[in-house]
A protein has these predicted regions:
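Short, high-confidence coil segments that cap the C-terminus of an alpha-helix
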Residues: 20, 68-69, 96-100
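N-terminal glycine-rich phosphate-binding loop and ensuing alpha1 helix
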Residues: 1-27
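Residue-level detector of flexible, active-site-proximal loop/helix-junction positions
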Residues: 6, 50, 79, 107, ...
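Conserved core of the sugar-phosphate nucleotidyltransferase
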Residues: 82-175
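Short phosphate-binding loop-to-helix
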Residues: 24, 30-75, 79-92
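Active-site donor-binding loop signature of nucleotide-sugar glycosyltransferases
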Residues: 4, 46-48, 77, 123, ...
Length: 175
């Protein structure tokens, strides 16, 4: 709770204040669904078997029958302080072949890097997100952590945008 209101209700308000044409909450929780509906949010119920939030988003996009060219901004339910300017900027930074994007910045301190509350991303040289983890990846045996990134954005420098490509593991088709 933040000043007597749930975090997710604040995220719903934030998303509604953006330029997004549609807002959907993807969840597997009836409790979250009921709570979000009390704020007039659209809710898509998804499987509880997902390994990651991106898997949940891919399922929600399939349920909603969204065309691949529709940009999807993944605003986490625990990000009530994301600047709305960033939410509004992200669709313009997506490529037509990669409709889902996560922004990332380099960690500035070891405390955040070690925190399981901060998501880490491994990026390819071309800045494509390869995978995410709440643990430090790869594990450092020396205790020195250099070149680690977190899914967020440096609003002043679009150099840190990571695109993501999703594949259907059954037949290796792009989602």
């Amino acid at each position: 709770m933040i000043n007597g209101r749930s975090v997710i209700s604040r995220v719903i308000d934030l998303a509604n204040s953006s330029n997004a044409s549609n807002l959907y909450i993807a969840t597997d929780s009836n409790e979250i669904m009921d709570h979000c509906k009390s704020y007039d949010a659209n809710v898509v119920m998804t499987s509880s078997d997902h390994i990651s939030g991106m898997d949940r988003i891919a399922e929600a996009a399939r349920i909603l029958d969204l065309p691949l060219e529709i940009p999807i901004i993944n605003l986490q339910g625990d990000e009530p302080f994301m600047p709305v300017q960033i939410i509004n900027q992200l669709p313009m930074l997506l490529s037509k072949d990669t409709p889902i994007s996560t922004a990332s910045i380099q960690f500035s301190n070891a405390i955040d890097l070690s925190s399981p509350h901060e998501v880490k991303v491994v990026r390819s040289i071309s800045k494509k997100a390869m995978y995410f983890s709440r643990a430090v990846i790869p594990n450092s045996f020396t205790g020195e952590y250099k070149n680690y990134w977190t899914p967020s954005i440096d609003f002043e420098s679009n150099d840190y945008i990571s695109e993501q490509i999703f594949y259907n593991s059954k037949d290796d088709t792009k989602i």
